[in-house]
Amino acid sequence: METLETIKNRRSIRKFKADPVDDKTLNIILDAARLAPSWSNTQCTRFIVIRSTEIKNALADSILAHPELGNNPATKGIRAAPVVIVAIAEKGLSGYFNGKPATNKGDYWYMLDVGIAMENLVLAAADLGLGTVHVGLFDCSKVEDILKIPENYCVVEMTPLGYPEYQPTPRPRKALEEIVYKEEFGKK
């Protein structure tokens, strides 16, 4: 699939077939994430691959209910997918210069770096016929305990990964005219 076609056709997947994801396919997807750009090439993103049912269930239990919608639909996806990938960031690298924050964004640059890497990952997965969904509403402390994450790392995101049970229909998107301004905010 061409890149733009993959972007247009990718959907958030929460229901998966039981079919396993082989190591070769998984490594292609992880390699796409590894190649993502990062602040000053710090490459602060790390990935933890989980296949264990016990650990996937513990991660699913860490997912928080949505304040307005109730149960988070990602919970079932984390339990059912053959693979879950957790993305973490090494703190104090991204957005730093000579050991100090380089901008007023401080240590939050790692969120951008992980986001870029994870988008590479989900697009590569979609290109290979696999499904994912970005999951960020979870109890970070619980996930850190489950996965034995050191203090100098931060859990940013996780995604279930597997073959979709079905392909959801496209969700509505805002028109470019609604989201693009010229020269300054609000100027069409």
For every predicted segment, state its role.
Residues 1, 23-31, 57:
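Short amphipathic alpha-helical segments
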Residues 89, 137, 163:
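Short secondary-structure boundary segments
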